[in-house]
Amino acid sequence: MKICHVINSLNRGGAESHLLDLINAQLNDRMDVHVTVIGEDNVESYSIENELLKNGVNITRLNGPRMFNFFSYFYMYSKFRNEEFDIIHSHQPRSDFMVYRIKKYLPKKSKWIVSVHGKYDTYLEKGSLSNNLRKYFMKRLSKHWQSASSIIAISEEVKSWIENLNHELNVLVIPYWIDIKNSETFQK
């Protein structure tokens, strides 16, 4: 099975940690795993890029502004069309939006999986124009999720949040796991 994960950056956070564990499990099952990164990593934060490269994961970096770059859309479309992935798995709102826009024009019907890693608009302050635009964007994005093959939430709380955005979505809960064997924070 050929899978492409799409994510905003590889700076380690919750979504990126989950992605790394998921990719390691997929590699153990001998899947052909690729990662498309929309934006650049912040040099002041830890990146999981070296861990992915060490495991032989093909990484494509678009290196443009994370969402509003026409060339990034064209490059991602070309990659998806040429590679003919069985699954395209997006991991954050910007990634979801780009995959939604591009997938409509792909000749092969790859399955699109969306992972929702948190309640994205709930940390915003009220009243700010930019925050109101983000909330509007999330409501619109939840309508785009209807065309996904599967929507995965990390918790029941996130599932409820998604369903409040769009009651027509069928959301599956798959909680994060902790890889104790590879964790430095746990003692055996």
Ranges and model annotations:
Residues 1-188:
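Membrane-interface segments of envelope glycosyltransferases acting on lipid-linked substrates or membrane lipids
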